[in-house]
């Protein structure tokens, strides 16, 4: 899949997690999923590192737009 497809899947998954568990828990749990979604991608270590600092959906969206 392309980066745009992966990014949209991450954001969709994040929205579902937030709906189910709230933003605080949903974002924290998505950190490991982001690592799974980006495993094997070139230069993904920085994205995984930076995603561990994200605390809101908006921050994640900005990070993914910046990294893309």
Mark where each language-model region is.
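Alpha/beta catalytic cores of nucleotide-metabolism and tRNA/nucleoside-modifying enzymes
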Residues: 1-68
């Amino acid at each position: 899949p392309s980066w745009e497809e992966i990014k949209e899947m991450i954001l969709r998954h994040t929205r579902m997690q937030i709906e189910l568990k709230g933003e605080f828990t949903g974002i924290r749990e998505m950190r490991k999923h982001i690592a799974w979604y980006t495993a094997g991608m070139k230069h993904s270590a920085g994205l995984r590192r930076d995603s561990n600092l994200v605390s809101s959906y908006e921050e994640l969206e900005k990070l993914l737009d910046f990294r893309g």
